[in-house]
Amino acid sequence: MCDIDLKTCEKSSKYKKKDIVDLGKKCGVDPYLPNGREKTRQVICTEIVNQYSTNPPSSSSESDDDEDMGKQDQDPICGISEKECNKLDNVNLLALGEYCGVDIYTPEGNLKTSKTICKSVSLKQSSPKAQKSPNKNDLINMDPANLKKLAKKLDIDWKKKDIKELQYLIAKKLNSIKSVSPSRSPSPRRSRSPSPNIQNMKKKELKALAKALGASDKKLDKMDKNQLIEYILSRKKSPSPVRKSRSPSLRQRSRSPGRSRSNSPVRPKYRAADLLGKKVVELKELAKMEGLKKWKDKTPSKMLKQDLVDFLLHVGGGGQLPKTPSPVKPSASPKTRAELALLKVPELKAMALSYGLKNFKDKTPSQLRKNDFIDFIILSTQKSQSPPPSIRSKPRSSSPKYKTKDLVTTDESDGEIVVKKITRKPKSPRRSPPASVRRSRTPSVPKSPSARPRSKSPSVRAEITDDEGETPPSSVRPKSPSVRPKSPSVRPRSKSPSVRPKSPSARPRSKSPSVRSKSPSVRPKSPSVRPKSPSVRPRSKSPSVRPKSPSVRPPPPDPSNSPSITVDPSVTPPSSVKIKKRPELPEYKGGNADRDLEILARRRGYKVIPVKGDGNCLFRAVGKSLRLNQNIKYSHEDLRAQVVTYLTSHKEFLEPYLEYVTESGDTTPQEYAKNVERYIKNISKPGTWGDFICLRVLSEILKVKFNLLILNTRNFQVISNNDTFKPLIPLGFIDDYHYTALTPLYAEPIAVLENETPTPSIAPSIRPPPSIIPSIAPSVRPSIAPSVRPSIVPATPSIVPSLKPSVVPKLTPSIAPKIPPPVFGPVKPLSSTRELLEEADKVHPYVREDISQLARAEEQILVSLGM
């Protein structure tokens, strides 16, 4: 049967796989692989045919010993042909290479190809067998050349030695080798394929190996290749489990009865890599099967995964504990909430117990749930991280709040000071633009000459009127109020309270408590009182209390009187001269910028049209203003595209703005060209903030001027590329980061000069003031007839005065004076009672001023009449 044909054995339906396995056993072929699995039918048939072809039945009289020696010399498994070896699958191929003692790994640690492994197997099988070691007679009969070769193989120094010495040294060396070497050569199946060198492995493979040994992903990301190698070497890997024997027949054949072996050490039951790849629940079940009750003073419920692995390795390894790192106590902040949520409840419970958990939320550890354990762990880590409590300063006492408005008058003066109710408003969050955008968007506006340096101890100022006679809103309440009058000179403030002498024109103040209004950014620590001066200085940043004047809404200013900024694109500054950067706008210190701009625009006769702040606000504001004021429709995409097209075809337009276009500071032509392209590319992207260069380009394209109302300076500024352009497009500008559209409140705006005269301290009434001259009859008949004497006039004295007036007063004819009709602007509809009360509060002090002026005029009329 062993002389079966290969084709019949492989493909005949007469024989099943079981029959082929039995046939292989009968013919002396092992049908099992080293791992215990059966070989494929094709491999078994090939080995049977090869076995029969190499050892055919012989009729010659050969001894049984010679047959046995021939069988031992020829290995049927390793004698497989390369063609048949290449057809094997990966599992059988690896088993074949390991069985035949062939290196299946490259020096870099990678697996060799199937073709390379098969070639190595065939070469090893076809290599000549090792000869017997020469005996003493062979050494005597050996020629000197062969003696030298043999000495060289045995690492014997053969130089300067004669033949007898070489024979003696070789014989001595061979005897020592025979005494150390085992009595028989090891079986081929005992040779193990060398493991890949860890130094030659790639970082990706090292990470996978370290992860299998229990390293976390977070730890692996921070480790380089050398640290990975150190970590893998520090984790002592347990040896592989016992390999299954190929077959019972081979097992019996390998153990000869006459030869005794030394007892090999017991191999461990568990491998560290296998245990670390299992879950905690599976490890606990294995530990219970091994009889776990307590380990390292911990019960199974308190043990972590590493404790369970150490226990199983200790039990299965014959009492030898591998060098695995002990469980580290959690640090101050071991894991985040998300990482803790990935852990199992037993692990969380063990971690919480390590932090000293006894009772949490009136529950014992056995009653707590997963979220409770996570809360306790995070709370414990926060306590360990929290610094010692610091001494906190007590909050400042708030200043008194005034619920109503009162009038404070002086002893000798008829002037009145308004006490304003101060309410704290939260600051509206404002986005701060990037430095590059902030620099490029700032219009060239110099700082106001009236800006005063801030002192360390600011005191209260009298409220200073701007060119509209109104006070800008603010958001900070003063701590201790005081009154500071108007003064044209700028004086540094002192750190201590001081009282300054009154000017000759100032009237004495009463000793009643003074109140000031809000300060925009700081709280005064010490009050100071200053006299009132008749002159009025320009508005400063710190508003204070002042006598209010009637709210007369001035019309928008005449753009012809405003300074326009004209740029000639043909003028190019020399490349050697570096242009100085223009000053930044003064920082806005108000509370709500949008609300303040609405108030400022309403005083100037404009209405604010909100614009979406998405980076396209400049183009959106220009488009809205064109549609509302000039009835021209443009979308913000169209305007941006026109700017990009114009700058692409007129790159010389950007030459006057080298400092804003050049980012690197280099003004060479090559660098300038790169920066121009970069600037145009950035502006072409939707959402990129526009700047004043875009405004000038739009002015040139649309042939218009832009009247920019800047909140920081509270003034208009005309931006244009040519003074000859007539249409004026109003825009609002907030704190160097946002543009809005404006539309006039009046149908025909009245031109007003930019340099407006200061608002008088006593606002004009709708009636003309009376012209009063003593001893001359008034031109206007008094409201009380002379025949009816008022109660405030004393009776006529009984003694006739000796002096008589030179001009006898006469009654004025009953002709009504010609009073011009009042002019009222458009009335804004009120939406709530609150707005009505606010308007009434604004008018109230002015009405009282008018009444007091009328009372004084009446008194002077009576005095002039001698009454």
Curated annotation (Swiss-Prot):
Residues 606-745 form the OTU domain. It catalyses: Thiol-dependent hydrolysis of ester, thioester, amide, peptide and isopeptide bonds formed by the C-terminal Gly of ubiquitin (a 76-residue protein attached to proteins as an intracellular targeting signal). CDD domains: OTU_232R-like. Transmembrane segments: none annotated. One of its GO terms (molecular function) is cysteine-type deubiquitinase activity. SUPFAM superfamilies: Cysteine proteinases (SSF54001). It is an enzyme of class 3 (hydrolase). It comes from Tipula iridescent virus (TIV). Hydrolase that can remove conjugated ubiquitin from proteins and may therefore play an important regulatory role at the level of protein turnover by preventing degradation. May be involved in TIV genomic DNA packaging in a manner related to the Gag polyproteins of the mammalian viruses. Its EC number is 3.4.19.12. Pfam families: OTU (PF02338). Residues 565-575 have a biased composition (Polar residues). This is Putative ubiquitin thioesterase L96. It comes from the Viruses. The active site is at 614, 617 (nucleophile), 738. Residues 234-258, 421-430 have a biased composition (Basic residues).
